A protein has these predicted regions:
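Detector for outer-membrane/organellar transmembrane beta-barrel domains
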Residues: 1-139
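Structural signature of outer-membrane beta-barrel channels/translocons
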Residues: 1-2, 78-84, 144-150, 160, ...
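Outer-membrane beta-barrel biogenesis signature
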Residues: 21, 147-151, 187
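Surface-exposed coil/turn segments at beta-strand junctions on protein surfaces, enriched
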Residues: 80, 132, 146, 187-189
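Flexible, solvent-exposed loop segments that connect beta-strands
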Residues: 120-127, 173-184
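Mobile, glycine-rich extracellular loop/lid and propeptide segments
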Residues: 140-143, 149, 154, 192
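C-terminal beta-signal and adjacent terminal beta-strands/loops
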Residues: 150, 154-177
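Outer-membrane beta-barrel "beta-signal"
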Residues: 188-198
Length: 198
């Protein structure tokens, strides 16, 4: 059931070399970079990590830019309880795809990480799959209270799932990911955040 002023919004998007129009709000950070840490049950691993990078393009010295393709959709339903309160449920799902040449710049010519930028940064000894493609999903609920005009308080809970395609382990130096020098398991990550705004 809907009430006066309720809204339903749905959007779909496809980009080719314009990733920020799709991914930046989902992944956040520089160039849509999403690096998420979590727990692990892998013996010898310090933590787990998931990578989702979404630049507009990638290139190597002396080569052409390889455009990154993305697709996605998002939607929301807002219900107005009365003139002061409303609640919205929202969600989004997006995919980031690198072409074969772009993948070779990152994962090397054989896709093993050897000879690519990922292997150079994180090593390849424990890497079992090198693939920069990923999907990201988001589901959230926000409630807003507007006691007077131009003043709104809100509480927003968001769940995000990063479905990344790297597998195996990496061993890092402390500066490369801002964590202790250790072994990290590569795997999908889930996060929940709550924001209070005024």
């Amino acid at each position: 059931p809907t009430g006066p002023g309720d809204t339903i919004n749905i959007q779909g998007v496809y980009t080719d070399g314009a990733t920020r129009y799709n991914i930046s709000e989902l992944a956040g950070g520089w160039a849509g970079a999403n690096t998420v840490f979590g727990g692990t049950s892998l013996p010898g691993a310090y933590q787990s990590v998931g990578f989702g990078f979404a630049p507009d393009s990638v290139f190597a010295v002396g080569t052409q830019q390889q455009l990154i393709q993305t697709w996605g959709m998002r939607g929301a339903y807002t219900h107005n309880w009365d003139a002061y309160w409303n609640t919205a449920i929202y969600g989004a799902y997006a995919g980031v795809r690198y072409n074969g040449t772009a993948k070779s710049y990152i994962c090397g010519p054989t896709g093993s990480g050897v000879g690519g930028s990922f292997g150079a940064a994180f090593g390849t000894a424990g890497l079992t799959s090198c693939n920069p493609d990923y999907n990201i999903a988001q589901l959230g609920l926000i409630t807003r209270w507007t006691p007077v005009k131009n003043l709104t308080f809100s509480a927003d809970v968001t769940y995000v799932h990063l479905d990344q395609k790297y597998a195996g382990t990496i061993t890092t130096s402390s500066g490369s990911i801002g964590k202790p020098s250790a072994t990290y398991e590569l795997k999908d990550q889930d996060t929940v955040q709550m924001l209070f705004r005024a």
